[in-house]
Amino acid sequence: MKKNNTILYYGCAAQARYASSNHGLLYSPSQAHLFNFSLARTYLNFSNGFRAFSTSLHLSYNQPLITYDLQDHTIDIEEMKKENLEKSFKSNTYIFKCLLNTINNKPINEKTQMEIEELLNKFTYASFSKKLEANQKNPEIIDYSLLNPKLAAILTDVRPTLISIINNLQKDYPDYFMAKLFKKSDKNEYYIGLVIKGLTPEEIINSIFFHVLKVLSFHTKKLDKSNSTSDIAFGMGKVLVENFYYNEFIKIKNKLSKEEQKCYYLSNWKKDNKDIVEKLEDNIFQFLLGQKISNLTKDTDLLDMETVTMAYREKSIVWKPTKKILKVLPEDGTLFVLPKKIPMIVKPKPYTTRVNGGYLSNDLYINENIVKEKWNLRDNTQILHFNQIFDLVNNLSSIGYKINTDVLDFIELYGSDYFKNELIDPRYSHPLLKKSKLTKKEKMELDSFLAKKELQENILGLAEIFRNIPEFFIPVNADFRGRVYCTPEYLNYQSTDLAKSLLLFSKPGRMYKKDYIALSYLKIYGGSSFGLDKLSANDRIKWVDKNLNNIKNYRNGKLIKEAKNKFLFLAFCIEYNRYLNCLDNHDVSWFDTYLPIQMDATCNGFQHLSLLSLDSNLSKELNLSESTWDDVPKDFYTFLVVCFIDYLKTELLENKNLTPKESESYNRLINMKIIREIIKKGIMTIPYNVSNFSLINYIREGFELEDNSLEWYIYKNEPSIRLKSLDFTVLGKGLRKVLHEKFHKLDLLLKYLDQVARVCTLLEIPIIWTLPTGLVVRQSYMIRDEVRIKPFNHSNKKFSMKVLNKTQFNNSKQITAFMPNLVHSLDAASLTLLLDFYFKESIDVKNIYTIHDCFAVPANKMECLISLLKLTYIKLYSDDKYLLKLDDDIRKNIRSTQNKGCFNEETLEITGDSFPDPIKFPDVQKVIGIVPSDFDFNVLKKSSYILN
């Protein structure tokens, strides 16, 4: 292409205008090689270079104007097209293309959504036939004979054998034999027969093939526990039971009148048949059922078993492809199955007290409650009549998203240039794949590589599927503490930075051009995603202004290559360019922004503990104190490092009992540059009651043994940092000691919570607390008994299984889990109250997503969100004084479970016949203080970094 002084401005409406060469080139990366200008009143001259004129410029989101500096770079359109095709990261996974076909060929409505859910959940999208013509007529079919003809032929050949085996299995359970089995004390075999007889051979084969193909996907993983025979058995058993439920439910539903059918759901059937359901939900039963069916994969020479050493003294039996299957598989791994749960193309069904929501098939052939219970808890979480949990889940699930196609296009075109450490080039084959025998370290390295590749393919593949969907939804549910989790796999806002960067809100936030605050938050986010979150807000704003040219010309890669969060920074650059281009459009006074900008709480677990205990000293280090945008945000980890070094120096001067090795370790740590990243993960876990052993291991995680050394460890991210084993112990124990000595009220709170858990454990009662959101958490961890079973027909190997003993508490778990569960529940309650404020705040578009202590909204809503978060903390900890309410909940539970008059409110002593000495209940006033605290909640309102 001939270069000249006239260059083109290329707009999203494919309109162009004249500009001189010092202005730069504007183009859409998604159409970088298409330059098709056949619009009226647009003139082009290609003989002497580009010349263009346009009457107007209209901006829509997914085709922004992007500046590119031609003084530094020249562009040859054909070369760029050729080069980018060679470096494409575009997902070429065949199974994703087939699902894309299904969505593209159908209207976006509830019927199509139901069809998608059925395809994914029942694995009805698979065909192994060689009759391509028939399959091509049905876009819902994934023809595995196209994906892998030899594998498809093997599965096609084995199908008649499987049908014959399954038919014989069903004949093995005649009615008289079932009656005989029912009379036995162990009814597992009876219920196995019940389920097998209640399914069609096709349903059983679909489950078998799904799990076989799951094992074959990236089969070269050496330490993949998801392919263990136990995990596959549980998974298969669960699927078969769900299919059985659906079949039985439909039988009953079809007998009802049309009016009755409208309000009859799977949950109704399960309540009516709770005795059967209780048995079929049993872990041992589902394992035995799944193992019986998965054994057929060995009988038909599809899979074989292998014993793998996972870790020291930890072995696992895993499913592996047989030699026959291995011959037809690619060595670098291929995805053979689609994720079962993906975003929805229509708004999720709302949860009510009567009907389960989320996916449209929920309460039809799947059954997922609004609160997902934990299997090792005896008692379920209770939702009170007046609650905010249903609104929380329904509101978050109703927020629409769309794919950031500009980010997706950029990644597909330039992934290998700018994201070498973040993405795996599709053409790259790991050298360890060709090595026959691997060391433990090499196995871990290869597994990590393949897991990353599988995650990347799923995220990019799903992004391609939803590329042209104008609005899709991400349903959520809650765990037993009220914490919100996304239901879809891979492509969701709680996934990786890659997934988050590909998500935009489907409806814009309106940001007025003169809204300095909103613009500032957008710039602050840009600086933070680049890696400058430790600078003051104003310094981040100045950095964006100073680097404006490279942000405009982000394709040159200068900033992207240096960015800490490259994908998020790329999304910011694209959005900021849209804003700059919008400034040129004088017909509108606002900018429609779709980008979620994220801000995090500072050490959120410690924030809740400081507010619970009203510890003003601790809160000052957690950005809960007065600050301005000129101030540098507090960094709790760096603060603790400084305190720790002071502690070591004091110990060296005053502690005469230090051993020579300890003194050597102290001096080494003092002279070494302890960076915050080394201690961050360990410190983060302290509010969650981590043991000293685990704390030390968290610190050690970032290190590895130096080559040819048995005593020196090097920090992986900075090999110049070298430590010995004793140094990790000194770090872990020293940091905890500093924390407790520096913050006395925190120490008192931790001791109080520990004592509460110990008292409840001694009394053998669950620990129950009520959250202001209407959720009642009932912590009741039970011990697990070991059961040995022999599930294989062809092997004498026995499995040791852990099953829940619902008669005996797990005392140690009850004690250690109380504080982390309480903190997580308070985190969840804060979010629930915040969203209640947020959705009632005004009638305009509500866009928000959350990752526990991270919040993302459009720039025009960030100021409002921060103000509401401050009000939430004040309501929860000042107005309602939650610690006193917690104390009252625990006492009420004790009084209700013990003999009348056993709890002396004055002495706080608990007496009873089952324990000889009185049990002392901790005094909450020692934490809060009889003298009013100097904690000033009004200071919260003046904090500029409560989110940063």
From Swiss-Prot:
PANTHER family: DNA-DIRECTED RNA POLYMERASE, MITOCHONDRIAL. Belongs to the phage and mitochondrial RNA polymerase family. Pfam families: RNA_pol (PF00940). Keywords: DNA-directed RNA polymerase, Mitochondrion, Nucleotidyltransferase, Plasmid, Transcription, Transferase. The keyword Iron-sulfur does not apply. One of its GO terms (biological process) is mitochondrial transcription. Its EC number is 2.7.7.6. This is Probable DNA-directed RNA polymerase. It comes from the Eukaryota. Transmembrane segments: none annotated. GO terms for molecular function: DNA-directed RNA polymerase activity; mitochondrial promoter sequence-specific DNA binding.
